[in-house]
Amino acid sequence: MEFVKNAGNSDEALWSFWACKETAYKVIKKTFPDVAFLPRRWPVTFDKSKSKKSDGLVKVPDKGDIYIHLFSNPDYIHCVGVDELSALDKIICDVENLPAGKTDPSLFSRLCLAQSLAKSFSLNLHQIKIKRTRTKGELQPPRVYIDGRKTDIDISLSHDGCFVAYAVTFLNKKNSIL
């Protein structure tokens, strides 16, 4: 926590560490569904340069390393991660402003992701669905369906306050993203 104490903006530094640890948890959980979130045991190192994007690493004992990109600006902090370093630069991600009004942030984040996928694949937006299913009564992570068929496209969706975010990669299952 010395880094947080000595940071020019301690709030940003603290939230950056937290975002990195949450990202690592979401990535690890895809491979190890029963993993517990133990953030105090997960050291984070990153190159906190003056740029808006920093690279880093979260070490999850007995599970592996998570490689991260941390994006920060005065309005938000956003972190994406993978379990294979070679996949880190293959992530497509974005942060969007949630429209004013009674917009459901979960639905809006899915719409933003679907629009990005439609553009990437030259598809009609209506061909793409983002769904969550239940297994043994528990909601599973969202999955991408194209023309009604489940894909292996790895995605992550999030929302907080007036922002929504998504991350996607088109790699195999081992190369998980956030």
PLM segments and residue spans:
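Core catalytic alpha/beta fold that binds nucleotide/phospho-ligands
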Residues: 1-178
